[in-house]
Amino acid sequence: MRAVDDLGYTPNFGARVMAAKRTFTIGAIIPTMENAVFARGLQAFQEELRERGYTLLVASSAYQPDVEAAQIRALVARGADGLLLIGYERGHEINHLLAAQNIPTLVAWTYSGTNAQPSVGFDNRAAMIALTRKVLDHGHRRIGFISFYVQDNDRARERLVGLKETLQDAGLPDDALRVIETQYEVESGGDAFEKMMRSATPPTAVMCGNDVLAVGALRRAREMGLSVPGDVSITGFDDLELARIVTPALTTVHVPHRKMGREAARELVKMVEKKSLGTSTELDTWIVIRESLDRPPR
């Protein structure tokens, strides 16, 4: 083997492709590369693919359905053996293209027992229900929610649905909740937080659709001279590393990103190699209570 290395030998990839009738390439389209929400899971996805002899091609849709559609077409045209997509929601034209091309496709970052499309992910609605119950258990009755735009984003929409259902089940009136939809950016989270807190009846707890928005809210609270959680509680979603290192540390929903990435890679390779028709796996999430959540001010 050392002699092979010394000679600079490279395995004949073309021959391998022809023999297997595959390119040993997997495409993944994620909504953004600008924050850490997808990084950890995608890293684990790539590691597992590499162990199985596959190369990963990654594209970002910038949360734009038309961009995602163009990238799907490009990856299909380049002969990707399989695709990893984020979330269920996309247009009929793209679903028809994927079916017509017969390309194995797996969805991640979400799970629904009623959706037939193979997925490895978690129940966004159930996760938000669990977090909202914790917030209510602390005595909060005026809630703010900073969300990404729910149109064309089933993950964001399901989190909002879970929040609304929980507040309704608790008997709270409609005006107990204020929702602002915005970009998944730190500054956007801060702007939405300030708008809520300067209203006539500000919330006592601000829940955020992910940790990036929550960090923006924390930073803006400090700039406004507000104590967290003394004046207002703040929660996130994802349990990124930054949720543990900010001050105060964020109460959030832990999402098993690395496990999700590895299991998604295993299932998608099985689908590509025709060892599976595609099965769905639901992963557990759990609430991590940290310093940013406490009882409302008196």
What spans do the regions from the language model cover?
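N-terminal helix-turn-helix DNA-binding module of bacterial transcription factors
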Residues: 1-24, 294-298
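Bacterial carbohydrate/catabolite-sensing allosteric modules
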Residues: 6, 47-52, 76, 100-107, ...
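Alpha-helical recognition/docking segments in bacterial nutrient-uptake
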Residues: 13, 21-133, 137, 198
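Flexible, nucleotide-binding loop/lid elements of kinase catalytic cores
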Residues: 16, 59, 278-279
